[in-house]
Amino acid sequence: MSIIDPQLLPRTAVVNDAGVLSIGGVTVAAMAEQFGTPLYVYDEEHLRNQCREAVSAFGKDRVIYATKAFLCGAMARLAHEEGLLLDVATGGELFAALHAGVPGERCVFHGNNKSVEELRTAITARVQHIVVDSFDELDRIETLHAEGLPAPRVQLRITPGVHVDTHDYVATGQDDSKFGFNLNNGDAMRAIQRAQASTAVELVGIHCHIGSNVLSVANFADACAVMVELFLSVDLPELTLGGGLGVAYTNGETAPSMSEWADVLKRATSAIPSEKKVFVEPGRSI
């Protein structure tokens, strides 16, 4: 019997009676012999199944893959082929996605403290939208627009004031987070009003990211309740619900399934009119 919990392994993983582990029909011993160690193995069938489960729940072009979880040309193409948009958080990640053949309009440009050159590259590439993190970033975009660049589609990152069950270093939704526009101190509404009045941006929505490797679906429900209330009050066409769905790393650790997470988000957004677009970010769970 394997001492490794099956939920820690890809869906195609098999441990035979001799204790030999295979992934996708190939033993890890054979892979180690061919490629050496340490060796990271990604199973394409497992990855595509994860993508398809998320897309089945939310629809094509509504699921955004966090490339910071893992990015190479093959992974970028796989996510794109399966109907996911790509979340890129640096100029380098955007370059890698574009170089892999992913169109700019299927990339969402994330990240805090984006440089002027990164913003210029994203606008020139006509990314799907830019997630604006601060008033300084609005300043930079307005400067680029004054230089003649087109007004990009933007979503504003809102800090909803929600604490999550994850490591403090990767929790990003609480009031003292350094990311986004704080809802409870009024910054969020000030940012929305400024963006709506600006000719330098096309404000299309709001976004939140409550943390990475979140293991409690209740945390997502709490954040959704706050964000949906705000979203309905400002009457914008798009809402993105972020904060990566967690995965188990050790024996005995449990994580919500993709379907459990999807059910919570779908219930929490049920009051949103059908003509509005809801995007989700499943994080490393893909």
Give each language-model segment a name.
Residues E142-A146, A151-P152, H167-A188:
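Rossmann-like NAD(P)H-binding beta-loop-alpha module
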Residues D87-G92, H110-K114, A151-A171, V201-C208, ...:
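Non-cysteine beta-strand/loop elements that form the S-adenosyl-L-methionine
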Residues Q50, T159-P160, N184-V201, C224-L236, ...:
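Structured alpha-helical segments in the cores of large, soluble enzyme domains
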